[in-house]
Amino acid sequence: MLFVPRKTKHSKSFKGRISGNTKGGSELAFGQCGLKALEPCRLTSKQIESARRSISRSLRRVGKVWIRVFCHVPVSKKPVDVRMGKGKGSTEMWVCKVQPGRILFEIGGVSVELAREAFRKAQSKLPIKCSFVEEGF
């Protein structure tokens, strides 16, 4: 289950920069515990899926997991041994631009200790520093 859009308005996009803190998605909306990003980065769909699998294995079919980010930015890449020019390369992967303060995952229906352990394992799959947040803090 890779997180890629079914249909897009534009097939390629500019690289851009990730600046500032997140404007939305910084509060818990569904679960009691969450994993919050502390650094800016581009998360790939494979990294999100790997973290989701790690969380699901830790919870052992107890509780519910919400994924609060989605990959909607295409990243293009030209093949190896191709000269400069001749247009932009084809889409290599899909990424999600994450700003500091963004909630990545939420868990509900489990104890805080189990959620903290699941997020600790998921954090090792991600390329950024994250923090554990609870409801009411």
Swiss-Prot record:
Gene Ontology CC terms: cytosolic large ribosomal subunit
Gene3D superfamilies: Ribosomal protein L10e/L16
InterPro entries hit by this protein: Ribosomal_uL16 (IPR047873), Ribosomal_uL16_bact-type (IPR000114), Ribosomal_uL16_CS (IPR020798), Ribosomal_uL16_dom (IPR016180), Ribosomal_uL16_sf (IPR036920)
Keywords: Ribonucleoprotein, Ribosomal protein, RNA-binding, rRNA-binding, tRNA-binding
Recorded superkingdom: Bacteria
GO molecular function: rRNA binding; structural constituent of ribosome; tRNA binding
Pfam family, one: Ribosomal_L16
Biological process per Gene Ontology, one example term: translation
Family, as annotated: Belongs to the universal ribosomal protein uL16 family.
Function in brief: Binds 23S rRNA and is also seen to make contacts with the A and possibly P site tRNAs.
Subunit annotation: Part of the 50S ribosomal subunit.
This protein's name: Large ribosomal subunit protein uL16
